[in-house]
Amino acid sequence: MGMTRQAMDARIDEHFGFEARDDVDGVLATLSPDVEHDIVGWPTGPARGHDATRPFYEALFSDLSDGKVQTLRRYYGDDFVVDESLWQGRAPGRPFGIEGRDRPLQFRLLHVFEFAPNGDIRRENVWIDMAAILQQRSHG
């Protein structure tokens, strides 16, 4: 028997909450110790485990600020959720290798979260609307 929708939502919302507070340790606490963390297109490729995943979040939190995630849709399976969200905030650094110049930024994300039996996120796969980011960076 898989997790309930409410339990999956609570874990994802907790994960996004730690991200909004730039809390690397909090984010990692929502992930299983052997997590597969796959940000599609990230230069170093998929990471496995907390130690390999930490650098992504450290870079992300220095490159983006004042972030808010708005959930648009969620689709559920027994032990997974597909989450479509909209991220809005500022880009003081170089998010995803693109100069941010501390301007406002918004882009859609598609997450596939898979859960371990204990409720930890055992796989996080993220697809980012890079075209939207590039378009916003090329104007202004």
Predicted regions and their residues:
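A short local loop/turn or secondary-structure capping micro-motif enriched for an aromatic residue
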Residues: 46, 91-92, 130-134
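Basic/polar N-terminal segments that are highly enriched at the extreme N-terminus
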Residues: 1-10, 138-140
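A solvent-exposed, acidic/Ser-Thr-rich amphipathic alpha-helical stretch
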Residues: 5-10, 24-78, 86
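Generic hydrophobic alpha-helical segments
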Residues: 14-15
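Short beta-strand edge/turn micro-motifs at domain boundaries
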Residues: 82, 104-135
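Generic short beta-strand segments
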Residues: 84-93
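Short, surface-exposed loop/helix-turn segments at secondary-structure junctions
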Residues: 92-102
